[in-house]
């Protein structure tokens, strides 16, 4: 990674994930209190996707703790997750039962870890998989057959 790029910041990523999780939690409570998924199917769909993305980002924090490259991947995914959540809620805040721009505190993180330069830096080397030898053989076999 170039020295002028932002250094991965897992503590900031965790804060952004918690912020996003809080927004999703408010949306879930609002959905439950207002007729549920049968009445608000689009909201339920958006919440399901958002919750999955938030929890995937949370799981990536452990991966990110394994090294600098892994941390960069975790930060980029977290930035992409929160960007997607912002686009899901923009203009639909009332449907979610939330205030306007509830993720504005995440914008500095987005600027750092969603920048084209930062994202492009991830393509220079594949992230380590951290698999045991047996699973690496499975991957090699599948790649040899289909890759």
Regions found by a protein language model. Name each.
Residues 1-147:
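Flavin-dependent oxidoreductase catalytic core characteristic
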């Amino acid at each position: 990674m170039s020295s002028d790029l932002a250094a991965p910041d897992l503590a900031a990523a965790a804060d952004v994930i918690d912020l996003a999780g809080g927004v999703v939690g408010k949306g879930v409570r609002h959905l439950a209190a207002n007729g549920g998924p049968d009445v608000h199917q689009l909201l339920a769909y958006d919440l399901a996707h958002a919750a999955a993305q938030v929890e995937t980002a949370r799981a990536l924090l452990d991966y990110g703790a394994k090294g600098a490259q892994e941390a960069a991947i975790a930060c980029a995914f977290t930035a992409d997750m929160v960007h997607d959540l912002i686009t899901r809620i923009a203009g639909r805040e009332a449907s979610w039962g939330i205030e306007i721009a509830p993720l504005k505190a995440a914008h500095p993180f987005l600027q750092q870890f969603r920048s084209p330069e930062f994202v492009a830096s991830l393509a220079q080397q594949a992230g380590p998989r951290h698999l045991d030898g047996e699973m690496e053989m499975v991957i090699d076999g599948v790649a040899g057959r289909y890759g």
